[in-house]
Amino acid sequence: MGIKYFFKWLKTNHSESIKCIDRHDNSQCIDVLLIDMNGIIHNSAQEVYGYGSFSFPKENACDKKVYSLVCRQIDRMVIQFKPKELILCIDGVAPRSKQIQQRQRRFLAAHDRKKPGTEFNFDCNKGNTSKFDSNSISPGTEFMHNLGRYIDIHIKKKQKPAFTGRETTDAPQNNWRNKDQSWRQKVDDTAEWSNLTVVFANDKVSGEGEHKLLDYIRKYGNSYYTYCIYGSDADLIMLSMSALTTTAIKNIYVLRDEYKSPNYLLINIPNFVKNLIKDVKSNWTDKLDEKRFINDFIFMCFMVGNDFLPHIPSIEIMTNGIESMLAFYTKNKNYITDNNGLGEIFNYESLLPILKDLEGLEQSLCNEKVNNSEYFRDDLLESSSFLVTNEFGQQKCVNINEYREKYMKKHFESSSEASLMYLEGMQWVLSYYTLKVPDWEWSYKYDYAPNLTSIIEAMSFKQIGGTSKKEKNQYKLFPVNSVNSTEVATSSSGFQKSFSMVFQNSLQNTKDWRDKKTKTSSDAIPPFHQLLFILPPDSSDLLPYPLCEALTNELKIYAPKELIIDRAGKRQEWEGIVLLPKLDQKVVTECYLKYKPYVTEKKDLIRDIKGRTFKYQNGEVSFL
């Protein structure tokens, strides 16, 4: 999902950087086509099984039809854009901080699947109707293992013309895709595949698909090539912007499907960055360091939403969050991020005045929410408001200090712990998007973000009410000027230790931090281990026996009987926060170690291995 509403903001404010192209247009010169595969996989499953954007399933729907549709979509993009290199990446095991969000989504999917008309599955042999579990689109499942094999065979056949040939696809019924189906017709693509270099990272290669794509660009990027990344997540825009500052490439685009249309939308990232810089330069007195500004912009965008931290309550794109941050950024004229030679860090002394300016907007934003029926009711806002009379009649006005206090008391036992952990998370996200995974095991443990006041207090080294002497020495803060990002990349027991300053009892010297050496490097957990963490009991059959027993026995206590979704202050139902019991990772690890030795079938064991990236060239296959 990435940053909610960011693409809408981009279309509204920088439409000149977006071009609409139809599926017959092959005029766009692309040297390297990179595909974030999970979007194609989900769309294909929805089309075959008739859920999500599609009203009816295909006749005799089965997994093989999904695999075939995925490969046909790849074929058509190869034919249209004629790249020299094709990079295909499927989501592998994710960092712990992403697994928390994945767990929320999969419990929500299991909850929604109980509703009528969702995720149909027609048995190919018997014609019976059952449910298709979209949670099977997760690393380590039989569905994903078979898909990886299918794509592998498909690529090999394509590079050996004697084995090519495929069936045409059936047109879906009652769907917008009926408007133009000519782009789906079978064509001869032998020439396009014969000289094509293909790189394929399946679900056994750890890491999110989009980050594996960017890793490829960082390692093998060619400044003379034009790169195009296909996918719908706003993350891809941020990663592409980051590539302009961390690699030698100059031309990079993001391609995505146009909503309810057969066309594509092509985002010109260098053009977008150029116009963004132009807007800021007009209010910047000194010479603007463009690379630092790009990283600053990426950092600020993550404050309005990302997949690893809940967004700060009063900073939202739909309430001009990005515009406000840019205005305060140009007002203060201080760079937020810096590169110490080993990686990007953020300077809290530069960020602090921006947050203070944003804090000044909270009153009007809260008043807007409590008086606007477009938002779901927020009981905290309601209980903190009082009636006032003005020229518009009677309206509610929020006692902002009362609301801030109630918010923190409701959601956190210790506001200092939450604020400091959130700051750690901000550095984790910055490192993740500009370098690599800082720590696979780190995660933010709360469902909500602290409010701006609490974060500002923590950054100002003010003692927060209720903070004990023990807590002061336990929780950490980030360095001001430099940090060893190599240590971050190899952190194991604590990402906090690498980017930390212990709260001193006197709180006097804000630039005195302890740069602690880390002991061992953390790594991604095995796929079955992740499935135990993210799957609800209703999806236990996606794990082999006896691992599946853990979800319905030891781990069942962490699954709620009724799903609670907090939509307070949200505009849309899908924005709600899924509240789940906190899962004890030690218990999950114990279950994995307890049951894994009894998984003996080779077809199951192969799904739990750590894979390697394949390279296909001239009919030969090698490892990258």
Swiss-Prot record:
GO terms for molecular function: 5'-3' RNA exonuclease activity; RNA binding. Residues 161-180 are annotated as: Disordered. It comes from Invertebrate iridescent virus 6. It is an enzyme of class 3 (hydrolase). Belongs to the 5'-3' exonuclease family. Gene3D superfamilies: 1.25.40.1050, 3.40.50.12390. The keyword Plastid does not apply. One of its GO terms (biological process) is nuclear-transcribed mRNA catabolic process. Its EC number is 3.1.11.-. Keywords: Exonuclease, Hydrolase, Nuclease. It comes from the Viruses. PANTHER family: 5'-3' EXORIBONUCLEASE 1 (PTHR12341:SF7), 5'->3' EXORIBONUCLEASE (PTHR12341). This is Putative exonuclease 012L.
